[in-house]
Amino acid sequence: MIIDILNSDSDPAGRNIRAAIDELLKNPPEGGFPLFDGNEVTFHTVSGRIIHAEKSAVNPDADLIIVVSRHSSVNPVPVLTVHPAGNFGIAGLGGNDRELGLTSPAWMKSILQNHAEFVPEGYRVSYEITHHGPTDFPVPFFFVEVGSTEKEWNDPAACIAAAKSVLYARPSPEIVPLIGFGGTHYAVRQTAIGLETKGAFGHMMHTRDVGSVSKEMVSQMIAKSCGVFAAHIDRKALSKQEISHIEGILAEVGLEEITEGDLRKMNAMSFSTWVAYRDLAALQAPGLKIFPHGRIFDGDPAVVELPSDLFSAAFLGYEEIFLAELDKMGNIFHTTGKGGRLMPTLLTSAKNRQKVSGDLIVLSVQQITRTQDSLVEGDQITIARRQFDPVLARTLGVPSGPLYGQLVAGKPVTLPDGRMITPDMVTKVVRTSIKIPGLENYS
């Protein structure tokens, strides 16, 4: 792969980042800088502003272009940024109207993560939404910037940090390439996703553009982000009408949405594995949500359905114990339904299904025998529960009201006629039997 690093001689931050790169290259770490691992790196400097640069300014054989540059803002803050180039509307700062540049989610994510590692004290780290030119470079490219005033552009610590972010860039193959909708210029939610999950953004659109975006522009965002899997919508930054508008376009172009919550759940699993489990859950019941425990391995997913009466008897009121046991098991999802209620539907790999099913039944029976008066016989478990019997209470002359409450709470009461009624006198034993085929085979 040929990587061309581009800067402008009229851009102080670009000059200083390039100078920092040159200086760092004099003393590379053992094994060299990751940027050079299997790659050929070339350098070009142009005159004038890079936002107006022509295709002829770069290495014609390059596969990727990294532009090092200054960042300016009407509300200046010390910041290290990375962003794609493009214009969602009229080209006010270089490039062509309504044209986006090719870009690379994987490389931008790696730079963003390096920014977070090398950032000097007092600086923030951020994606920026897609903006300004150029837009017609023939290969993926993006801007690595130091902002936002002359003080930061000439700050050696900031420029060295940006240089290190470039030299130590090593894209991970385990990413989820995305396009993004909503948010402010500094792309707060997208930045958090890029730093804390496998999500890697290509083109990102400011809230102000979402309401009027066309299907053609969304298609361009997808195509020029070079292989995106899904779209992220910052719903808190958009109105209901804007959300509905973009959802409709995504449905038309066939790109699914993924939430920040789902990205955080994915941990080490592949995107295709996540989708397979999510879609299987959707077939079981509308609105079923999935939550992984431990590492989820690739492979065909399968459903494990615990008998609902067994599940309720074992874990109603003991949900945290159940979830902790799933953490120990790993390679399994629990599910929740309406209102976040824990469901007896679990998901695991097809090859693991039989073992998981047996383990969960044993776990349920053990939980019941540990916490309740119960008896296991053959393929049946019988649970005996003592509970207040209002019929017995009425028979003994206990009036409804506060005295009932005291008896239910396990306290004796004295009736107006002087008789004492103890809880045992108004308690009945209710036995519930749950049949579990094959229970006698589980140890």
From Swiss-Prot:
One of its GO terms (biological process) is D-amino acid catabolic process. It holds the Pfam family tRNA_deacylase. The keyword Acetylation does not apply. Gene3D superfamilies: AF0625-like. Its cofactor is Zn(2+). The keyword Metal-binding applies. It catalyses: a D-aminoacyl-tRNA + H2O = a tRNA + a D-alpha-amino acid + H(+); glycyl-tRNA(Ala) + H2O = tRNA(Ala) + glycine + H(+). Its EC number is 3.1.1.96. Binds 2 Zn(2+) ions per subunit. GO terms for molecular function: D-aminoacyl-tRNA deacylase activity; zinc ion binding. NCBIfam families: PRK14866.1-3. Monomer. D-aminoacyl-tRNA deacylase with broad substrate specificity. By recycling D-aminoacyl-tRNA to D-amino acids and free tRNA molecules, this enzyme counteracts the toxicity associated with the formation of D-aminoacyl-tRNA entities in vivo. HAMAP family: Deacylase_DtdA. This is D-aminoacyl-tRNA deacylase. The lineage of its organism: Archaea, Methanobacteriati, Methanobacteriota, Stenosarchaea group, Methanomicrobia. The gene is dtdA.
